[in-house]
């Protein structure tokens, strides 16, 4: 488990592999960083980068709106789609009251 940003009590240190308050990313020192989306000297996303990880992030850019990021698991679930504005894959499901799984879902 990664610690929460708020769990770290010392001042933020760029290059310690922990994303702390004020940092977008932290991939270690400039000599060791292998993250093409992160500027290791500033712990900020590189110019033009929108994201660095997530099911809706591809090569430092958000995947297009409507791109499937997770398939439906059953008839009560729906395929999850990227918004084009976030690296997160939001969970979609049938609305409450919608019959599914032989009215057991």
From Swiss-Prot:
Under the subunit heading, UniProt states: Monomer.
Q: Which cysteines are joined by disulfide bonds?
A: 25-43, 27-38, 37-60, 51-57, 56-82, 69-89
Looking up InterPro entries in the UniProt record yields: Disintegrin_CS (IPR018358), Disintegrin_dom (IPR001762), Disintegrin_dom_sf (IPR036436)
Lineage per the UniProt record: Eukaryota, Metazoa, Chordata, Craniata, Vertebrata
Location in or out of the cell? Secreted
What terms describe the molecular function in GO for this protein? metal ion binding; metallopeptidase activity; toxin activity
Q: Tell me which Pfam families the record gives.
A: Disintegrin
Mind telling me which PROSITE patterns this protein's record contains? DISINTEGRIN_1, DISINTEGRIN_2
Q: Where in this protein would one find the motif D/ECD-tripeptide, according to its record?
A: 75-77
What tissue expression does the UniProt record report for this protein?
Expressed by the venom gland.
- Record-given protein name: Zinc metalloproteinase/disintegrin
What EC number(s) are associated with this protein in UniProt? 3.4.24.-
Task: Give the source species.
Answer: Gloydius brevicauda
Q: Which residues form the propeptide?
A: 99-105
